[in-house]
Amino acid sequence: MSRNNEELQGISLLGNQKTQYPTGYAPEILEAFDNKHPDNDYFVKFVCPEFTSLCPMTGQPDFATIVIRYIPHIKMVESKSLKLYLFSFRNHGDFHEDCVNIIMKDLIALMDPKYIEVFGEFTPRGGIAVHPFANYGKAGTEFEALARKRLFEHDAQ
């Protein structure tokens, strides 16, 4: 069953040939659409191998692969808006751990998912690789326990 125009309202970036790339951190660029299967529990996974941010101390670029996994509830993130949102970090100065937590919190605010996790595999700098992991499970649901379990086992992946 195809989506109708009413279901696609609010999606303005996908298919737009005049894409404007943000020059600074832009959470407002994120767009969501309705999940047609809110009663099914399933994972959506995004692998974003070209993430870039700036070191807040030196201004030097940091590169990472960001992996986002979530179990949607009512809303889902539209992928082109996610791409542009992640691009908006290109001139944003923050530590790796901050970037991962900011991404997770912005996606929670947008979608209110049942569960979400964000993993950053940053390129080593000074001989040290930083791989922050942040997750969230909706309070009072089975996903709260899943978040705790995944947090303690995330390095076993």
Swiss-Prot record:
The protein's location, in the record's own words, is: Cytoplasm
Keywords from the named record? Cytoplasm, NADP, Oxidoreductase, Queuosine biosynthesis
Its pathway, per UniProt, is: tRNA modification; tRNA-queuosine biosynthesis
Its chief place of residence is cytoplasm
* Gene3D superfamilies listed in its UniProt record: 3.30.1130.10
Report the GO terms under cellular component. cytoplasm
Which EC class is this protein assigned?
oxidoreductase
Q: Which Pfam families match?
A: QueF (PF14489)
* Sequence similarity: Belongs to the GTP cyclohydrolase I family. QueF type 1 subfamily.
**What is the recorded function of this protein according to its Swiss-Prot or TrEMBL entry?**
Catalyzes the NADPH-dependent reduction of 7-cyano-7-deazaguanine (preQ0) to 7-aminomethyl-7-deazaguanine (preQ1).
Protein name (record): NADPH-dependent 7-cyano-7-deazaguanine reductase
Q: Which organism is it from?
A: Neisseria gonorrhoeae (strain ATCC 700825 / FA 1090)
Q: What is the lineage of its organism?
A: Bacteria, Pseudomonadati, Pseudomonadota, Betaproteobacteria, Neisseriales
Q: What gene name is given for the protein in this entry?
A: queF
